Amino acid sequence: VTGVQTCALPILGGGLVVGGRIYHGAKPGEAEIGHVRLDRAGTIIEERCSGWAVDRKIREACAREPQSALSQRTANLPSGEARALAPALAQGDPVAQRILAEVADDLAFGLSHVTQLMHPEVIVLGGGLSLVGEPLRAAVATALQRYVMDAFAPGPRVALAGLGEDAVPVGALYLAQAAGQ
């Protein structure tokens, strides 16, 4: 395609930086990486890898395995079970390890599509789930290598956002300020 200023890419919750600048598509809502499909049935990254999706996975796993360390840590939580994942991982809980592996694999598979299209230098994991920290980063980085084509090996560096779950509001404030609002 020639003679256009923007080009639509099938990348749908996050953001892209291209040439050191925030990428803006033809319409607001570009780079919705969380809406990348994981299968033909329409399952998107957000449905399997967001904080609320991990909360659901944890509730289901704890109902099946009530003696796990993860179950013990979430027994009295009304919501936000994903916050218990990091401490349960630190205890070596196999239920927590299994959930992390599933989430990291799904996230890496979805991000492999972004990698094949954009070939970024780095993928930054932010939001509440990034509070799991290094175990999440390492698991996604390892899983991503299975899905990235050989020409892009070893694939992009995977990093954790310094802002954690504050990335979205801070980014929104930055964009509002940049727009002069």
Predicted regions and their residues:
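Glycine-centered small-residue hotspots that permit tight backbone geometry or close packing
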Residues: 3, 13-15, 104, 108
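ATP-binding/phosphotransfer module of carbohydrate and carboxylate kinases, centering on a glycine-rich
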Residues: 22, 40-181
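Glycine-rich phosphate-binding loop of actin/hexokinase-like ATP-binding domains
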Residues: 8-52
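Structured loop/turn residues at beta-strand edges in well-structured enzyme cores
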Residues: 2-3, 31, 118
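Short, small-residue-biased leader/transition segments that mark boundaries at the very start
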Residues: 1-9
